[in-house]
Amino acid sequence: MRLKQVTPWFCLRRIPELGGIWNPWSGGAYRNACMQNSRYTFHYTGFPPGDIDEFPGVEQVFRYLSAVAGEDALRESTRLNTEVVSLRKDAGHWVIRCASEGKDTEDIFDRVIIATGELWQPRRPPLPGEENFSGTLITSRDYQEPEAFKGKNILIIGGGVSGADIASDLVPFARSVSLSVKKMGLYLPRQFPTGPNDMMHSYLGRCLLSQMNYEDFIGYLDTMMPDYMQAYRASGLLPDMANNNAVHVNEKIIPNVAAGLIKVKPLAERFTGEGAIKFVDASQEKYDVIITCTGYEMPDYSFIQGFDRTQLYEHFFWTEDPSLAVINPPVDTAGFGAAFPYFDIISQWVMNVFSGKTSLPEKEAMRKWCAEHMASLHVKRFYDSWLETIRIGLLSGLLPEPARDFSRYWNIISSIVKPAYLATPPAFPEHGMMDSLFDFRIARIRILSGLGNDALGYLLKKGDITDAEYRAALEIDPRQSISVHLPYSQTSL
């Protein structure tokens, strides 16, 4: 064991290369996976991707992340093949014990960020009688390429995006593909007739979409994508009710089911004595391969001495000692939206807190937030990463304050979700292709109405709003106001 002096900063990684699950050799994303977000929206705020496919695949995302690391000279300060064994606070400093190549070392730091990710330890659904199954039983984490399953009868368990992706990936090679689901959410394609799915709405458009009647939304989709929606109804999978914002992105699963290429089965219950799967409707079938796609376990923080995950303010700052931050997805959320710009703005917030540029609330206020929001970590909820980016950007002071700089704030939220606009608001709003569904003029007044009389007076004097907008905002029923944070439904149906 050797003890090092305090160092400026290091990045410690367990695997031998950068890129996380997008590293083709990490065993993370399977070979044919591609981004659910387009090249226009998926990237970090200050690092556009250049000339890549509209929806980049594993190799392209890996090259992009490698370029980001090279740009920031991250490689020189990164220790690969290094496992963090323990983390403890001692004499005002964080002591990190690591293991690498058979050696243990300790390093001392003033501040620590945990960014381990969540897509590493897959959940396995309980299937009694597994010992009777003589075929191949793997998880989505083990799946890499469809050719290995040529000519097999395959059952996929799980109705999420991974299940839909892998089932569709297998169709050209397997003898048969079945998909066992408890329920399925709303599946829409990456590409709409008018452009990429994620270019359809601005941030404000997404907020208003959350409030839209589901039947009206489906009616609009019928008009926009009649062939797709006809196949959706033929598949029998169109939900009777869904969260409009909680979209599952996959353009193959619905046409494949409608064409009979994927057979939908109810929830798998157990194995029979003969090794067949018995479903909850009492039907039974035998399979050569079963692939479970039922999510991932919560990240394991047991290596942090004295840590309590329920005391993470806003899911990121440890209330008992905010010199420790966790930049991982909030646990048990069904997220939708671009992860990179979302984590980008959280990272900026963390660094501003660490540097003293930004302050967090008092400890008691943070504990109160945790008591209200972190008590039920296993309750599944929808998490709109785009709208959370706006909320966190305002909370952290990284986006223009609406009460003082409404014009720049408005130009961000009423524009499509391009990451560059978070750093430099456009001179004029760039609306999404489906924003015409909503009356932004009225929405603007509803947002202004929640700012209060003093802020409205200031904005009028500054010239950010007109006299007509000022008067209209004063007349709005407070119950009709829209928060500047752009709230949305977190119900996961």
Range-by-range predicted roles:
Residues 1-22, 66, 103-107, 112-248, ...:
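Rossmann-like dinucleotide-binding core of oxidoreductases
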Residues 136, 140-145, 275-279, 285-287, ...:
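FAD-site-proximal beta/loop scaffold in flavoenzymes
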Residues 228-286, 290-296, 453-457, 462-489:
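Alpha/beta-hydrolase fold catalytic core
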